[in-house]
Amino acid sequence: MRFDPPLEEGHLLRRYKRFFADIETPDGEALCIHCPNTGSMFNCMAEGGRVWFSRSNDPRRKLPGTWELSETPQGRLACVNTARANPLVEEALRAGSIAELTGFTGLRREVRYGLENSRVDFCLDYPDGTAFVEVKSVTLGFADSPVAAFPDARTERGAKHLRELAVLARQGVRTVQLYCVNLSGIAAVRPAAEIDPGYAQALREAVAAGVEVLAYGAELSPAAIRLVRRLEVCL
């Protein structure tokens, strides 16, 4: 996934009200841009740290740009725009880059299913059945550790998705929880039980029910992002 036009660089002044970030560009221009991340962004940003943003020329937009990448306090690069995860995964699926999910004959997005009226990110159609794939974007890293964690804030919605996948898995349907790790320098992923023990428990129960758990790491730069390697999942 290439950024077109290329991202612009700035320094973070502050993030506030979840959806807003004040930044300063190298030429001294102060901008308020959109922050497309509803999580805590814990360990994912630092005031004064480098950020990269996409600029919009759409006169209908109230804000001139969107925060895309951040240099973390640990010196890693993170894609903070969670809306990038699904297109990034779809690109990898269509390219055959996710070895466990190749050979499908059809791909459907945002399909409603389950008793709790959820929407799964992707349904992959195979000659012998369908695979339900739920995607989560991971950006929570820690100093001196190559292990990232999810979530960075409590997420009942995430636990609900796992419950729904578990129901299908018990019925013999192939279900996959796929962690899209948009953070450089990572070798493995784990549930952040210290932040959301309910989600961690839901993940363990989903695995026991037969839900597959995959994690793929991204190669990130201000020019492009792409999923390049499978990562270990530590349950």
UniProtKB/Swiss-Prot annotation:
Q: Which InterPro entries match?
A: SfsA (IPR005224), SfsA_C (IPR040452), SfsA_N (IPR041465)
List GO molecular-function terms, semicolon-separated.
Answer: DNA binding
| Signal peptide limits | none
So what family is this one in? Belongs to the SfsA family.
Stored HAMAP family: SfsA (MF_00095)
Q: What is this protein called?
A: Sugar fermentation stimulation protein homolog
Q: Which organism is it from?
A: Azotobacter vinelandii (strain DJ / ATCC BAA-1303)
